Amino acid sequence: GKVIREISSREEQIAAGETKQVLCEFEVNHPHLWNLNDPFLYTVKTEISGQDNVESRIGIRSIRFNENSLFELNGKVVKLTGHNRHQNFPYLGGAMCDRYQREDADILKYQLGCNFMRTSHYPQAKSFLDRCDEIGLLVFEELPGWQFIGDESWKQLCYQNITDMIYRDYNHPSIIMWGVRINESLDDDDFYTKTNALAHELDPTRPTTGVRYLRESSFLEDVYGFNDYHLAPKGELRRPNYHPYFVSEYLGVMFPTKSYDNIGRQVEFARRHASSLNAFYRSSDMAGATGWSAFDYNTHIPFGHGDRVCYHGLTDIFRIPKLAAYVNQSQADAKESKPMVFIAKYLVPAYFEDHEELDQGYRGRTYVFSNCEEVELFFEGESMGRLKPDDEAFPYLPHPPFVFEVPYTFQGMRETTHMEAVGYIDGKEAARFERKISVRARAVKLEADYSTIEANGYDLTRVVVSVVDEHGQYLPFCQLPVTFTLEGPGELIGENPLGMEGGRAAVYVRSTMETGVVKLTGKCRDLDSCEIQINFVKPNGTFVS
């Protein structure tokens, strides 16, 4: 790229084993600012006497919380909306390759409509943060910990953790706050006065924050973070009692929802997300809100489910979206992302499923999530109306749900039953979504995210596994097992056989050091099987074997 500035420092003498900081200051005239929609990055090359060099990417931007307690990026107010991310993947935990660390950032921004996220509850992979820089996703990064505060030697490790975090990640323009309080811990004013001062000493350019579940707590940081679950059953949020203030967690813990729960619960989970977002946008002095959580995750205690999985996410642990994910996706501006429309309903001829909906008030009611101006819903080819969004129930939401009354029951379904939603912007069709009735399982479907990966021993691709009907739709309540065979120089990571969860699940295919073609086959009883191929190619860069 074009060199815009070049400077040299004074000569420094550094003894063997010594560490020294050398400050070089320079100005960039008329800089290209880093922002959400144009995350421009500069590269700074630092060289030591022609012997060694390192390249760092930076973004030039200004951040602050203004007198109205709102966040400003480059002088413009940004309402911080996002979710928490546990760096946890099925079968691999946190030890996932860079490809999928980066992809999580893409999911947060482009599939879940986030402009902001929290690294709960620890610093996360550099490759993830690099991707946040590249796509314009704001980050709150915090020191490791959860609830427990130890003795003085333990606290010394916390000081070191803060130091390491800030030194490692200082150059990331996406990071806008440092978390200097152990998540959900009790007050310890002496300890947290020191952590706050340390962060300010190491980085005076960024505000500090801390996350607590205490409504009345010592406010020692620059921004008050609060885990707000008190009004979750109503989908509400409390009013700020300190300023600046943001909600660091909401909803998920209080209404865990599996991808294979009944439709009534799944829709209610989505509706509560819409209601919580509506409450956030209603507040004129709440800087941000991050829901709990983006993805389901493994846990070390049961949390009531007995399988060591927390079902608090907008997606399942495989990053397969639940219905609620589309509430968040629909909040993105159609001009900045793309128009979308989604029917939050399955057409399943199941007696008990229909009656569970009746118990929870959803029989005949169909929610449609869209960022279009109008939506028309068709059932069996007949229009159920062309509606505006429900801004009476969700008056502050950028794009409220559309609610249709559709008079159907399972007894009236036929093999040709279908439902279609059409979204309109400026009176013209902008998006379309269709559901057909699911009657019986017909085939196994395998979909690899990537058909080509590097043969370096750690690169991999996710393979989404589905049991589908005659229309190619996954069966939302199917639990059948799929058995795999793998041919070629690869490794299958996951369960074999693998039971479906809501008709879908996933495995991973990891490369070895050998190039070639891998064939993965999925079989389930007498259903049509499926085979895919994945190419392992020579690595593009250097690696450590």
Language-model region placement:
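Substrate-binding/catalytic cleft of secreted carbohydrate-active enzymes
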Residues: 104-331, 336-356, 364, 390
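Secreted/periplasmic carbohydrate-active enzymes, especially glycoside hydrolases
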Residues: 1-123, 131, 135-139, 161, ...
